[in-house]
Amino acid sequence: MNKACRGNLPALIFLFSLLMLWQLGAMKVDAAYILPTPVQILQKLWELRSVLFTVHLPATMLVTVVGLAISLVLGLGLAVLMDTSSFFHKAIYPVVVASQTIPTTAIAPLFVLWFGYGIWSKVLVTVLITFFPITITVYDGLQSAKVEMAELLLTYGATKRDIFFKIKVPCTLPYFFSAIKMAIPMSIIGAAIGEWLGAQSGLGYFSRRMMTQLDGAGVFAPIVLLSAVAMLAVALVALLEKRVVRWRGEF
């Protein structure tokens, strides 16, 4: 057994045990419209594969990617502003924190009312959820740069631009990747919430439609697909992080 398999073995054992308990519990309840078994969910996912993969998954991914891209631009911009000026930090930080006290399920219907059932109401929900961890984590990364190193470069005639790109950016990269790994699942959740509350397509919308039909397995099938997509995306980002930040210890 190689090292990777040994490292993942505890997680696989825990997951298998959880699924077995779920299977036995659902069989005991014997009410698939309330608690379907994992086997029933996988069967439903296979039955619905065509409509889920060709219609609803692309719709959800479009909202997720657009929302995450906007959150990245917004979060990075706010983090840099707060790092460069104490005035901007005092002005922006409380607003950023306050934005996370707004219940998503309360504001999402307003976005639908203002922007309709198109993509932008769901994108705004996604941005509202995801820009916060990006902003705060990247800001902490920028603040983690050692002042002594910056002062040393200044004595050699370095500009603020040099310090930013040669010290702050390398120090921030691990924080940036951590922010991305947090933001990906949150962006998918945001897209699903937006679709659940008001949409004409998407995995969140499809799950809600199955709920109205008392199809428990149909409700869970899109959720399983969303979870799989999120785990795959986070794994890819982690792989990219290992390649990009492997020189970190030498810096």
Where are the predicted features?
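Periplasmic/extracellular loop-to-transmembrane helix junction in inner-membrane transport proteins
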Residues: 2, 28-69
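N-terminal signal-anchor transmembrane alpha helix
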Residues: 6-29
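Transmembrane-helix boundary motif in ABC transporter permease subunits
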Residues: 66-96
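C-terminal transmembrane helix and the adjacent membrane-cytosol boundary/short C-terminal tail
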Residues: 86, 143, 220-251
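Generic hydrophobic transmembrane alpha-helix motif, especially the helices
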Residues: 97-133, 140-141
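Glycine-rich helix-loop "coupling/hinge" segments at transmembrane-helix boundaries
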Residues: 113, 189-226, 251
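Transmembrane alpha-helices
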Residues: 124-128, 161-194, 226
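Short helix-to-coil transition segments within interhelical loops
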Residues: 142-148, 152-172, 212
